[in-house]
Amino acid sequence: MYGTWFTTGKVTDLLARTGLDRVPVWVPVVLGVVLMAFVGSVRIDPALQGWVSVGTVTLLLVLNRRRGRGITVFLMMLSLLVSLRYIVWRLTATVQFSNWLQTALAVLLLLAEAYALMTLCLSYFQMAWPLRRREHPLPEDMAQWPSVDVFVPSYNEELSLVRSTVLGALDLDWPADRLNVYILDDGRRKAFHDFAVEAGAGYIIRAENNHAKAGNLNHALAVTDSPFAVIFDCDHVPTRGFLRRTIGWMMADPNLALLQTPHHFYAPDPFQRNLAGGMHVPPEGNMFYGLVQDGNDFWDATFFCGSCAIIRREAVMGIGGFATETVTEDAHTALKMQRRGWGTAYLREPLAAGLATERLILHIGQRVRWARGMIQIMRLDNPMLGAGLRWEQRLCYLSAMSHFLFAIPRLTFLVSPLAFLFLGQNIIAASPLAISVYALPHIFHSVITLSRIEGRWRYSFWSEIYETSLALFLVRITIVTLLQPHKGKFNVTDKGGLLARGYFDWDAVYPNVILAGVLCAALLRGVFGIVWQFHDRLALQSFILNTLWVVISLIIVLASIAVGRETRQTRNAPRVSVRLPVVVTDAHGRQMEGHTHDISLGGLAVGTRLATPDMVGGEVTVRYDSARDGIHVGVPARVLDARDGTLRLRWAVRDLEDERQVVSMVFGRNDAWAGWADFAPDRPLRSLAMVFRSIGGLLRRRPAEAPRALHEMGEGELPATEEKLEKQSFVLKPVPRSARHGATASAALFVAFTALVPAAMAQEAPSPDQSGVTAETPFGDSNTGVVPDALPAIDPAVADRISDAEVTRTLTFRNLGATTGPLTLRGYSPLQGLDVVVPANRVVTHAQLTLSGALSPSLLPEASAVTVTLNEQYVGTLKVDPQHPQFGPVSFDIDPLYFTGDNKLNFHFAGEYRRDCNDLFNEILWARISDMSRITLTTVRITPERKLSRLPAPFFDPNQRSTLRVPVVLPATGDRGALRAAGLVASWFGRIADFRKLSFPVSTTIPASGNAVEVGVNLPVDAEGGRPAGPMLAEVANPNDRWGTVLVVTGRTAQEVEVAARALVFSPDTLGGVASKVVSDVSLETRHPYDAPAFVPTDRPVRFGELVGAADLQGGGFAPAGMTLPFHLPPDLYTWRGRPFLMNMWVRAPGGPVVDLETSRVDVSLNNNYLQSYTLSPPGLWRKWSERLVNQHAGAVGHVTALPPWLLFGQNQLQFNFDARPIDRGACRRTPGDIHMSVDSDSTLDFRRGYHFAEMPNLSYFAEAAFPFSRMADLSETTVVLPDHPDTGTTGAFLDLMGFFGASTWYPAAGVTVMGADEVAHTPPKGDIVVLGTAAQLGGAASGLLARSPYVIHDRHITVGQRMGLQGIWYLFQDHDHAGLKDGVTANLNAPIAEAGVLLAAQSPYDSQRSVVAFTGDTPERIHDLVLSLRNKGDLPSLQGDLVLKNGDRFTSYRTAPVYTVGSLPLWLRLDWFLGHHPSALYLAGLAGAGLAALGVWAWLRGWSRKRIARDDLTGEL
């Protein structure tokens, strides 16, 4: 419940008032996440995405100025939403797999980006709500305070480094009888032993150095007994209040196994020291200890970091001691304890301080060990697996482990632009606009949100520098450790080193120097490509984008190289800036009060007005007293310098007590490191400026350094050769503070040595397995294609001539279909042919073929020729003349008996260029037949045979490719029944004609010549004028032309006329061999949406064999003529995110040693757009034999091809082009040329993933497939509105339109409703509406039917209506077409309708899901001409938008009306579409999702914080 967690604040009050505080917290989280996921997956146009991005960025900048955890959580959700949109865009719109190299590079980059996004999510999860735990008070009764063992492990560190830590630990503010400080010396050095005796500390060594530091600690646990153990690395000096400020939590919570505190480093790390702007940037480790660990504490997933931590002995012993399986024993130990149910905690207060790694190479070595250890944990004891952890803890560990996998992704980001600049592989296929509106907001939100979260702990862009400095070193370690997790050993990190002078550390940066050189070369390549190479726009954009990418990578790499410029380090003891009140007393007893500027273990600087030069060389006493911290210092010092009011002093330490006091003053103060986070809040631009400043420091010459001697070795430092103790288990108990002097110490030492060693040896745990472990094992600090032009029409004047005399026509090959140029024959493609059509009502009496062209002059005349055949009958031979390669014109007479209706004129080439052997693919094997060659045919008409069984002949000839004319006689053009019947017959002819041009000129009388169809009531059915006895069909001679035939469709009533028409179109096979017949009505099945026979079914896979014959999918020769598969689709198929449809294609190629299947291929194209090429290579042997058992395609090669929806139209064509190569090409062996290849007719097309949904108005849908009228095959949901008294021109346009519908659906228009314009006012039309007629003919009906159109036709002009014009601002928010169409509003449309046709589409005023398409113009002839444009393939691309004006042969298209939709989608897909077209709604939905998720997460986090720490005084702001 919300009420459980919200106690204050406006949000709490609002929720309480509305009752929402009783809603479970997971409800808004789930709703918000689902909404964010949905919004993140919606695809929109890049321009619209730009506005969404502007909105999110603006909101980010506004909210980022306000404080509060709730706003931070919301900004994280907003950032994740923007990042989600980016990654979905990357995965769905920018990836191309053109070849294996591009695929590999693109996938690698995608994996790197997925890693980055996962890291971002985990970072938000960890840092969303830092717990900000405060110290827990101790019991007032000190008798209840527990005993504590303090362990200071060491191996090979210098004693000078360890002394301070031990002295600081001995000075801890804790009861002396309950404080035991031990040096755990795995180096067994006598000097350490002697120091422990002198200081009163305990000293423990062991016989073998098994498992390095972890083994050392385990041994110490075995020989000590305090309930708590505190561990300090040998350079981590604690403050005096360390135990008082930490033990309270361990006592308050018995289940707490670990309390970790920060590792603070008082010396600068390599990045701070070496970079020009480094000292103004937070240390590299601050983010982990200042933010990440605090976030881990929130989830009870604090990591043990090996030092500055309190461990409960019971907990660590319960897991068998400190983990020894990995080189990061600390984190692994915490993981094991958490698996057992122990809790962990973190106190974000630096209570100890140590030395950072002095040099970059040492820093790299330390991080390499950490990376190896975390990857070992991932491989050996993966927190994501196994029992014992909550999911929150698993995610925290996943974040830690995955962080050290950054090397490969970081390197991938740096070098990805090289893929294009060097290899020519474009691995992000996107425009600059798309990248700008998707990638840049993703980066911007991530940077700004992380900047807000990380604030003073980590500055923007510096993580990139830190990671780049390590990446190339970690790549190998990452791979090796993943593959061999047991490999690798514990390495100690050297600290406290000195540098006499600065130098450039090539060993630490040489990989990045090499990388920088490669990037510089890439930069030069990019500049060269941009400036000196000429490219198309896309290539130029790619060059610019990748060059900019290289520049960014180069900046990061140069900054990482700058870290390698090591600065001089000549101080053993780094200075700490602090202002402390001190009193300086000189040798004369004069006291000077002042404040320190800085202090160190070596000395200090004091500001005092009494400093004089004569004090230099003298000795003074420095006193510092702090009652709060219990520190009282009085230590002598020597004056090194005294000027400008500042004394520079060096400590003159006399004994161990003086050293202890110095350590206490420098490190023991409770607030010593309170300013560890005193950095200005991050500002990304300022941070970026610091990066450039650091790069400038790399390029700037360093001034000469004056030589400075290194600090001489002090008496406490080790000599060159150390004296070692014997390998044995030895325990020296610490001496209480009261006994740390003189004889008492000696006695204690003796007792410890003689009495405790046996006890220690008795307590020592059995030695673990030591295989592979030696005494030298180190340890240290842990951590639709273009439609071709139609064939030229034969001159109608010639075609329509009617005469008993012979008619001679000459057709060029171009007229016959050779529209692409000459017929070219080659050795591998020796056969070419053309169709020669002879009309069915004519017979050839004479024919002559005239050829011209050229034959290769390199051919052998006696062995080369071109053979000409007609219908496989020999016509003639073209012989080779090397001296005259061009031939013609050459004429051949053709026997008229060879001709049928559809004739094949073939040319077969046989050629050789040498006598012994020939290569069919040699370029000199060729012959060309000019496309201006011609065939002359003399024909004569034959007497017509008038039988109904021959229908549709003689009115339709299937062999004709020219425009077909079927004159229609309507004695009464205003008769609605006759119009419906004539429209039905016209649609039948349209179905038969299919793609051929067809027109129906209308007259009221029988034409003077030729054939015609007469439709009407009570028409004569014979030459004597007899009348029909019922619904009747009859073929009679044209009274004006004995060669012509009139098909009479009649009846006694209008209803009988329609019955006769239905019988004609639905059952022509039952009419019989008679000239006339009374017919019966035909019962028709109810049609269903989208069941038009022309449309490919979309509810099941469709076999190729259902669309074409198997012979159409076969070809002969090595390069047979292309095979085509035509198919029709409803144009309203919609898929989610444009997912492609699938074609499952099976290809058969000849086996045996004929074709080189590996190099042979088949090219697949869709509507003349290339899709893919596939090899003809068969499957492997196992697959081949298994397919023989279960697969009908055995022996064929299968491929799945994606058909992009944007390449599919109403009328489509798949093209398959084989290109085979002979297996013995070039050898002196004859290659068979009569091979056959095919596409299996059982191959399938699958459109099942499509939904019927379309955005309207769209005239291209209508022009391509008569949509939306063709939705019902019989047009049963279509109403045609005509003038009340249509003239013949308008009626002809109506019949032509019905023919177009029939050709589009392959089904007669049996259900169309025809009504007059005057009927519209009192009987609104139903369904989709077609309007035909001039504005004058339609009267007021036109304005009513087009009420929702933005256009107004008035006074022979078409304009944008006043209502639409005044709402121009509204159009700014509408969806606009980006196909180059004009907008009527912005184009100020005001076009005269003079000798022009107008095609207009709009939403129906009667039904929002219905459409109106209107054909109008100034004359009926213009309307008729506009309808005929629907049958002209060349005009179809011009019919788009919602308005088309046709003036002569010129089309102008407009899109002005708002979009409406027809069809239906599932709810989720409808929402996806809606949001994809309405960026404002998408933006608001995204904000709503982010807000809901943020609200729920905020409440959940707040409540969880209360569970972790219930008291307000023990935690920070909630």
Curated annotation (Swiss-Prot):
Binding site for substrate: D233, D235
Disulfide links within the chain: none
Cyclic di-GMP binding domain: annotated span: 732-1518
SUPFAM superfamilies: Nucleotide-diphospho-sugar transferases, PilZ domain-like
Membrane topology, as annotated: Multi-pass membrane protein
EC class name: transferase
Positions of region (Catalytic subdomain B): 314-374
Predominant localisation class: membrane
Keyword Membrane assigned: yes
Catalytic reaction(s) noted: [(1->4)-beta-D-glucosyl](n) + UDP-alpha-D-glucose = [(1->4)-beta-D-glucosyl](n+1) + UDP + H(+)
GO process terms (BP): cellulose biosynthetic process; UDP-alpha-D-glucose metabolic process
The entry's keywords: Cell inner membrane, Cell membrane, Cellulose biosynthesis, Glycosyltransferase, Membrane, Transferase, Transmembrane, Transmembrane helix
Gene3D superfamilies: Galactose-binding domain-like, predicted glycosyltransferase like domains, Spore Coat Polysaccharide Biosynthesis Protein SpsA, Chain A
Keyword check for Phosphoprotein: no
Record remark on domains: There are two conserved domains in the globular part of the catalytic subunit: the N-terminal domain (domain A) contains the conserved DXD motif and is possibly involved in catalysis and substrate binding. The C-terminal domain (domain B) contains the QXXRW motif and is present only in processive glycosyl transferases. It could be involved in the processivity function of the enzyme, possibly required for holding the growing glycan chain in the active site.
Name of this protein: Putative cellulose synthase 2
Organism: Komagataeibacter xylinus
Taxonomic lineage from the root: Bacteria, Pseudomonadati, Pseudomonadota, Alphaproteobacteria, Acetobacterales
